[in-house]
């Protein structure tokens, strides 16, 4: 039997294992220290730290990326582009690296090089929205509008959160032409059209909103309907907001005061059509529908004051449509009980767009009084389309400016050339 001495082999294996372990420890230490330097370089915008990170770990694409990021921050775009190129050679399927390289090349006015980089980003992430979006924006800046919007539509198809931005771009490029914008957006279904309608409503383009709503294949939901009315109202397109809102049972009319005698107990909490709106900040005043006290009809509004009412904010308001350059008489009834106030209550009317005062009543009575009918005239502006009726206080001469007691309000009406609901 031949006996083989295995000891030298075992020793060699052990030495090799130790060497490999030492190498791996050293490599791990170098990579770890490189990553530490990378973090510091990004935090401090330190080029020396970024250079050393690349020196310690030249095969780490993150080190090259960090160096490029620091160089870009310092305006050294040419050097940054070279670092991004090195990173893409090490990790060529990273779409974000290609996007960063493309953006850097564009900073150098190398739009063709930027496009080549973004082509690679799309190649490696063809089903993601962000690559198509970036490429589409670059093509748009290059003046290649048709190609650009093809890419942008792909982005919006992949991720609908891009659709509002697509609509915004199309609106700007089309110079606010709805038909051109629709073509650029590529309206495919009711969801796309509703997104366009919301955008138009935000812009106060009520006529275009109503035109587009007529093209929907399915009835508009109540939620969407109410949202569009709110958007048009907020954009101060009162005429079209009203046209969209007005219930079919009502005949549209200027000067229409809704719920003028408070027969409907609903008080709205946010601005809109259809009744009286209570200002959110005036929540210390108690409002109640009273069936015992009324000027006419079956009910009135009882208002109980317990010490606080901000003169700068109306307690109640209602927006009504009006005709331009026209005089309207506004009448209303009030009754008071033990009403004590440092500044009198008044009824006012303001232009809904400019917030210009159009008219105001005499001071409302204080103390204890029976029902009193008051009236004042206001004249709308040449540009007026809507006005806001407000119940508020006059300015106080002192602070605090208390108010205590009870007032009733009833029969608020525009009495000439109007129809009240």
Regions found by a protein language model. Name each.
Residues 56-60, 74, 91, 125-128, ...:
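A structural motif in tetratricopeptide-repeat
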Residues 8-31, 35, 161, 165, ...:
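Extracellular and organelle-lumenal recognition/adhesion modules and their flexible linkers in secreted
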Residues 52-53, 86-87, 120-121, 154-155, ...:
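Canonical positions in the second alpha-helix
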